[in-house]
Amino acid sequence: DPNPSQSIDEWTCGAFDCIAEAIDTEEMEVFHYHKSIIDTNYKLWHDTNSEFYHDFMHYHNRVTGFNDAYFARKNIPFDNGHVNVSSFTVQYEEYEGFEDRGELSFPNLPPNQWYMVDLFPGFNFNLRGSAYRSDSVTPLGPNKVLIEFRGYGLKKDTPEERATRIEHHNSI
């Protein structure tokens, strides 16, 4: 639409407020991009990735995150179909070979916090302390979707910080 009736902030209706200070403070850059065409329908992909039962499919999530705070999370709905999930502290050190990731958290983000924002109709943003990822899904047909995954780091990252951020991103 060349003449949108809403700004981005109006359209997102506050769904990004939970991570705004972490992602707006420093300039970011993409360090990872992957796309894939999946033989599934859009609704199935969206629902599978936005429901809480999704976490049960990931061994890593079951080991590092299933604590009282995890189960107290809430899906917080916003106008225009957007949702964010309240945060909890991920216990990375509970996963064999992992360690605490709090030292490299995004700006203004408490150590090892995890947030997820779903923007309807097809965008997902995950901020896991040191690693920020966005996924977009585009329907290509009734049973085919294009998924694009991006990983972000802070532009000011040192080479060592960037390597750690990439390792954290790739491990989830």
Please report, for each region that a protein language model flagged, where it lies by residue.
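C-terminal catalytic domain of Rieske-type non-heme iron oxygenases
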Residues: 1-172
